[in-house]
């Protein structure tokens, strides 16, 4: 899972590493439980956590640590799940700090917001968690559970992210092929999750979303029967959780986001703001979504009905500030900047080439239809290797004048070598645009084409 600092494009670990060998090495390097004065092997998630944040933050802690040690993804996810589950079944009161009332900047009628908040010490909680992880690893040395050894589809995912000319990098991304193992889901539907979050006003909201959206999705009872609804609820709940954190810690950041959940033979996408995902099928772009922007007629009407306004400065902005109309966070712009995501689904037939998820730093300057040619030319030059294609796409965005943070993720649904051998069926075809599959008619068209955002 790649929700920490941005990383260069990389393939998914093959999982071919010997699981018992990994456990042996791990326990050789960490032969004893941690003492209170010992340093943590991986950075703790902040200073305090609310109880609703514990599962996601500890899972992220484990996946970051195990990923740094090249653990096979199914093993890393299963280990993380078992250790988190065991710790959550214990009494966490020993980690409790004195409860305090959330400080309200303005009067709020929501009783939940006014209730005392139980906060836990993140450092001591992380130490206890690592000791639990060592214990589970020791137990599994004798007998590794089937879930940790189960074969799964090997995904080729190319990821590249750059700060560009901005002072700070505020994007985050997630690549989680072992979704089921991380959350202990035992139904027969294989799931993989991918996401890009584009932060603004700081990285806190983007990092938070990269940790908690998929955790909240996995905990929705309707995930097996209504994945779209589960993803929408996951965004909504993550927004509520972050707003509580933002009020406690006086954070002002926000983030747009887009995610793709591949569940068996169905693709589910959800989005908030202007980060986007497209599908390429047999060389043709399939538009899956319409980004949320202030100039969209329905978004403008929603904002004005709430008492806000949309104005054009260097670009269209909500209340003269934000260039997005929906986002997680942005505590001082709620409810005008909505935390309600949209979602859509599509059956996969096996003829799909790849998914591309990216932030507006890419899509504001690279039209959808140019993506196919850029990917195909890269595959041609690299003799069918798609490993570094995201770097090529990021470079193309920079050449076209993007100054924003740029994150691009390409999830191949077929072997790139097959795409090279099959050629780019849409390139140079005057009827390609007519054959392009467009977004569902239930989604509104934008009022105007949005200019690049600075």
From Swiss-Prot:
Q: EC number(s) on record?
A: 3.1.3.16
Q: Where is this region: Disordered?
A: 1-28, 419-454
Co-factor remark = Binds 2 magnesium or manganese ions per subunit.
Instruction: Report the catalytic activity.
Output: O-phospho-L-seryl-[protein] + H2O = L-seryl-[protein] + phosphate; O-phospho-L-threonyl-[protein] + H2O = L-threonyl-[protein] + phosphate
CC annotations in GO: cytosol; nucleus; perinuclear region of cytoplasm; protein-containing complex
Residues annotated as transmembrane = none
Tell me the domain of life. Answer: Eukaryota
Indicate the disease this protein is implicated in: Defects in PPM1F may be a cause of sclerosing cholangitis, short stature, hypothyroidism, and abnormal tongue pigmentation.
Q: Which family does it belong to?
A: Belongs to the PP2C family.
What name has this protein been given in UniProt?
Protein phosphatase 1F
């Amino acid at each position: 899972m790649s929700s920490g600092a941005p990383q260069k494009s990389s393939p998914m670990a093959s999982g071919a590493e010997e699981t018992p060998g990994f456990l042996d090495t791990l326990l050789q390097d960490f032969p004893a439980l941690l003492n209170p004065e010992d340093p943590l092997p991986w950075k703790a998630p902040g200073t305090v956590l609310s109880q609703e944040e514990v599962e996601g933050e500890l899972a992220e802690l484990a996946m970051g640590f195990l990923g740094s040690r090249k653990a096979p993804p199914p093993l890393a996810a299963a280990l993380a799940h078992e250790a988190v589950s065991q710790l959550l079944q214990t009494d966490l009161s020993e980690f409790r700090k004195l409860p305090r009332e959330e400080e309200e900047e303005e009067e709020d009628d929501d009783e939940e917001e006014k209730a005392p908040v139980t906060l836990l010490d993140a450092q001591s909680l992380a130490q206890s968690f690592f000791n639990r992880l060592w214990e589970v690893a020791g137990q599994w040395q004798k007998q590794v559970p089937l879930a940790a050894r189960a074969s799964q589809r090997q995904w080729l995912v190319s990821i590249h992210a750059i700060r560009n000319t901005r002072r700070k990098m505020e994007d985050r991304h997630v690549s989680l092929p072992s979704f089921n193992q991380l959350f202990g889901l035992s139904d027969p539907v294989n799931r993989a999750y991918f996401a890009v979050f584009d932060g603004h006003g700081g990285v806190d909201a983007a990092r938070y979303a990269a940790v908690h959206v998929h955790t909240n999705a996995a905990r929705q009872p309707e995930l097996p029967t209504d994945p779209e609804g589960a993803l929408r609820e996951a965004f909504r709940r993550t927004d509520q959780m972050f707003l509580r954190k933002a009020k406690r810690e006086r954070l002002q950041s926000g983030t747009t986001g887009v995610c793709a959940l591949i569940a068996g033979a169905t693709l589910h996408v959800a989005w908030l703001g202007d980060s986007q995902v497209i599908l390429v099928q047999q060389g043709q772009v399939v538009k899956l979504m319409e980004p949320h922007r202030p100039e969209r007629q329905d978004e403008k009407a929603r904002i004005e009905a709430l008492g806000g306004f949309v104005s054009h400065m260097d670009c269209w902005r909500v209340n003269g500030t934000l260039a997005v109309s929906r986002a997680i966070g942005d505590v001082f712009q709620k409810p005008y900047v909505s935390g309600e995501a949209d979602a859509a689904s599509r059956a996969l037939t096996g003829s799909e080439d790849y998914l591309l998820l990216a932030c507006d730093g890419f899509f504001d300057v690279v039209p959808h239809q140019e993506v196919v040619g850029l990917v195909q030319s890269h595959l041609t030059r690299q003799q069918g290797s798609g490993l570094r294609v995201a770097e090529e796409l990021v470079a193309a965005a920079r050449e076209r004048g993007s100054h924003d943070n740029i994150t691009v993720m390409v999830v191949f649904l077929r072997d790139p070598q097959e795409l090279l051998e099959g050629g780019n069926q849409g390139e140079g075809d005057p009827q390609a645009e007519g054959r392009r599959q467009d977004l569902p008619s239930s989604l509104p068209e934008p009022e105007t084409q949005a200019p690049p955002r600075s």
